[in-house]
Amino acid sequence: MKKPLRWLAALTVLLLPLSALAQQQGLTIDIVGGSASATPIAVIPMPYQGSDTAPQTDVSAVVGADLDRSGQFRTLPAAQIVEKPTRGTEVQFQTWRTLKQNYIVVGRVMDAGEGAYRVEYELFDVAKGERMLGLAMTARANAMRDVSHQMADAIYEKITGVRGAFWTRIAYVTASGKGGAMRYALMVADSDGYNPQTIVRSAEPLLSPNWSPDGKKLAYVSFERGNSSIYLQDIATGARELVSSFRGINGAPSFSPDGRRLALALSRSGNPEIYVMDLGSKQLTQLTNHFGIDTEPTWAPDGGSIYFTSDRGGRPQIYQVAASGGSANRVTFQGNYNATASVSFDGKKIAVAQGSGNTYRIAMMDRSLGSPSWSTLSPGSLDESPSFAPNASMVLYAAREGGRGVLYAVSSDARVRQRLVLADGDVREPAWGPYRTAH
């Protein structure tokens, strides 16, 4: 059985066979865990009040689903919404106090002309009867889900003080067919699985997608040339560039925080080592030189150092080395197997695939209070490839269930989990993208 470590797959040039699937499908979300301590919030249906064709997107449903899957909120079920105000002046706060709601969101959708819509919405503190937020947004019909995610982000941030990450994207790999007829696709979708987009198709395995910090490009590993090679690809235009095809392993690309460099694992000198490539000049700098296997680099948020997986101590653990090279320091000490690090935006948390015997789960090391504390985020037996949301509120990872691959997103406090699954296939290699910016 394949262990959750990309460098083992790279060394043996093997990939676990995946079952048939429809690659154009979006991922569907199934919340499989919740929290009784989540904050109650009523998201009232927002009716279309225009005279043209109503938008297909149910704005309030998207906003409510976003808040639910964050684990921080618990929306009021539709059957319990006894009143449907569309503006603050219509809100009867005592009704919502009786229903034990902490917050209420109301709004409406109107025509904005030329096929566009205007959404006006307000957020209220029920106990105080005070408005916390009042905004209006305009978009065309095909961007109404984007608007809905941005609304959820604003509501989330206003209440929690933490920037929301609903209007973000995820990358993942799918496959179809069996044996020699396998076909792979690198996909990008909204963080809730909608709007899937095929970035590249291949008859050979695709691995290790990694986002550029501006969200415009993906780096990934392809075996289409027979050996592993690393490509950069523009998501909007499809233009791609081959940046590494040395003899041996070319693996685990990771963009620097400024987007100018790429960390990668190469075995060009015989043993897998960590290198940094200047993407302008293509000049390589070797950071490690050890008889052990060094792989899976990921940058610290300040760009000053790189975390990586190494078995130099006998078993895979996470180490850290300066981006300019030098001696490496071991970071993880709990457990015999820690690999595939993902680092939170503030550098205080590190999510890893942690192994014990034949069981691999996602664990998180939190250094917020100084000395490291550990927590287990996933309950599976073969969980791998953790990837933090840009606000570190959730971790996306891959799992095996019923003989096929699925994705999970778990809150960083492990209170809520959600499964992202294709209707009839496998999905692996997740990577959560950066914040998006409105144009």
Swiss-Prot record:
Supply one GO CC term from the record.
periplasmic space
Q: Which residues cross the membrane?
A: none
Q: Write down the superkingdom of origin.
A: Bacteria
Family annotation (Pfam families):
PD40 (PF07676), TolB_N (PF04052)
GO process annotations (BP): cell division; protein import
What is the annotated quaternary arrangement, including any partners? The Tol-Pal system is composed of five core proteins: the inner membrane proteins TolA, TolQ and TolR, the periplasmic protein TolB and the outer membrane protein Pal. They form a network linking the inner and outer membranes and the peptidoglycan layer.
Name the record gives this protein: Tol-Pal system protein TolB
